[in-house]
Amino acid sequence: KAAPDLVKGVVALDPVTIDPSFLAFSRLAFRLWPERPQLIRGAIGRPHRFSDHGAAFNFYRGKRAFTDVSDKELMDYVLAAHVATSEGVELRFSGAWEACVYRSPPNLWRTLKTTKVPVHVLGGERSYVITPKVANRLRSIKQIDFRTLDAGHLLPMEKPQETAGFVINCLGQHSDSELS
């Protein structure tokens, strides 16, 4: 809103677009019981330090969220998300930070309806974030080009080539002069 002339379009990958009725409930629940939701407890309670990158990889490999992520992409994530310490490796961002992000879900609906630039959204067909109700609502907004991939919320790691192709195609819809 501060400098709309700097934005020619938006490309969003499985964005957190929560159904408004659930959004109101979740915001209230996070205020009343900030430590109770499973998502919060999981973020705070999971290990954040490992003896090495291999141990971190093995931990994530056993998690449902990473089931459809190839070994290569999972190791890329591990290497990017962890920093070496004198005791091994640790996540670059703490569980407390992750919990804070979960406690403050965005309400993008008004912005999506009033934006003046093209919005390209790629959602995962098996995503827990873009539910069928949310997908239908995204499809109903005229300036949104909504597409899906057979993937979950981690679609850039599950389908990296297809995701990159979507982004490149979206960027290619604007001339070089528009993007500079």
Language-model segments: what does each one mean?
Residues 17-37, 41-42:
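Alpha-helical membrane-targeting segments
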Residues 109-151:
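Conserved loop-alpha-helix segment in the C-terminal half of the alpha/beta-hydrolase fold
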Residues 43, 47-120:
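Alpha/beta-hydrolase
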Residues 166-174:
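C-terminal alpha-helix
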Residues 151-164:
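Catalytic histidine-centered segment of alpha/beta-hydrolase-like enzymes
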Residues 18, 129, 154:
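Active-site loop signature of alpha/beta-hydrolase-fold enzymes
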Residues 21-26, 133-135, 160:
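Short aromatic-enriched loop/helix-cap "lid" or pocket-rim segments at secondary-structure transitions
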Residues 1-25:
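Conserved hydrolase catalytic core segment
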